[in-house]
Amino acid sequence: MWVGVISLFPEMFRSVTDFGVTSQAIKKGLLSIETWNPRDFTQDKHRTVDDRPYGGGPGMLMMVQPLRDAITAAREAAPGKTKVIYLSPQGRTLNQAGVEELATNENLVLICGRYEGVDERIIQSEVDEEWSIGDFVLTGGELPAMTLIDSVSRFVPGVLGDFASAEEDSFADGLLDCPHYTRPEVLDGKEVPSVLKSGNHKDIARWRMKQSLGRTWLRRPELLGNLALTDEQELLLAEFVREEHQQSK
């Protein structure tokens, strides 16, 4: 996967390129990230990238010319057909389904806004999709872009050592993940559930599904309304709820 990033602060993306799974993916040639700074495309000695909005109001907007030229440069550098994304509070909220959808693209250009945003005509003429990471305000689009890169790259074949890791993550099947345990077997008097030490893979899978359903019911019940549970899942959830009520008495 190739990702081009348009940002006034390209140095921020070193946290993606130099560390963790994404860094390893870059070293393996599975992921490529390039950055373009609109300041490098300005036409004045002050390298101006912002201007006042028509109609007045607080703040400034990113100027059209430097931003458009940066987008053009990124498009031309892309190895193939490219989808251009603007990280925006007005965009579609990113979730696991959206991540998997975006992961089907081989090339992405991500535009990171600053100030009060960008000229609407840039969105109309240059942007294919707008995406948001939530209903809250950030100072720029860099953190959302890094979030998108991190989440999408997990679905690039070979990026994760075990692709099942991505398939079993929280939200991969619409549910929260189940609890996980490692050594020591007993910690502060709390033991690892015996089923996980049994070696019975069928029982372990059943326990994990039950815990996943139960955790979703406890913490994000609205997610269950979007799922068509199997008969077995319905039974496991009912069993979890019953046990939870018994423990709370």
UniProtKB/Swiss-Prot annotation:
A Pfam family name for this chain? Answer: tRNA_m1G_MT
- EC number(s) per entry: 2.1.1.228
**Residue ranges of the TM segments:** none
Chief subcellular location: cytoplasm
Any Gene Ontology CC annotation: cytosol
Positions contributing to S-adenosyl-L-methionine binding: G113, I133, G134, D135, F136, V137, L138
Q: What does this chain do?
A: Specifically methylates guanosine-37 in various tRNAs.
Q: What is this protein called?
A: tRNA (guanine-N(1)-)-methyltransferase
- Name the source organism: Aliivibrio salmonicida (strain LFI1238) (Vibrio salmonicida (strain LFI1238))
